[in-house]
């Protein structure tokens, strides 16, 4: 038997594995965030009621020292993550006096508001409240 023919089954197997792995790569499935202008407006209202005291009226000038939620700090802290990472963090830890007390829709709307203040534009498609679905949405610009 020719030496190259004895390698054929292994080569075919390795090629099949490579194709399957590349098809299952999560980063290939990531998209940019989707949200609506209505979500941004609802998010602005919710932000002003629940977040402004710590993070400020301009998202970077809070009275109680909350970190900036726009600009360089936001990009450096969240830019490599997903929308789901941001929403999951907010739901688990915000507001600090009673984390998780807001509705799923309110957290999602506030995230849409934050996205709109960090260079993302509404595209007319609702940002889903499901954090798993948001994990597929990259914050990388």
Identify the function of each model-found stretch:
Residues 1-8:
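N-terminal secretory signal peptides that target proteins for export/translocation
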Residues 10-22:
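Bacterial N-terminal signal peptides
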Residues 25-46:
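Electrostatic cytochrome c docking/interface patches
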Residues 37, 58-95:
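Gly/Gly-Pro-rich "capping" loops immediately C-terminal to redox-active cysteine motifs
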Residues 39, 82, 102-106:
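An acidic site on a long C-lobe helix of protein kinase domains
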Residues 43, 47-58, 110, 114:
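The canonical Cys-X-X-Cys-His
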Residues 99-141:
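Flexible coil segments in periplasmic/lumen-exposed cytochrome c-class electron-transfer proteins
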């Amino acid at each position: 038997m020719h030496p190259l023919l004895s390698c054929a089954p292994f080569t075919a197997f390795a090629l099949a594995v490579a194709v399957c792995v590349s098809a299952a790569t999560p980063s290939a499935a990531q998209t940019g965030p989707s949200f609506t202008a209505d979500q941004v407006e609802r998010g602005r209202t919710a932000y002003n009621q629940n977040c402004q005291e710590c993070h400020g009226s301009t998202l970077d000038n809070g009275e109680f020292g909350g970190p900036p939620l726009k600009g360089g700090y936001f990009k450096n802290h969240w830019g490599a993550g997903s929308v789901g990472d941001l929403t999951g963090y907010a739901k688990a830890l915000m507001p600090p006096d009673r984390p998780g007390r807001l509705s799923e829709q309110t957290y999602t709307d506030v995230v849409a508001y934050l996205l709109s203040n960090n260079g993302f534009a509404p595209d007319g498609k609702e940002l889903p409240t499901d954090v798993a679905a948001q994990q597929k949405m990259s914050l990388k610009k």
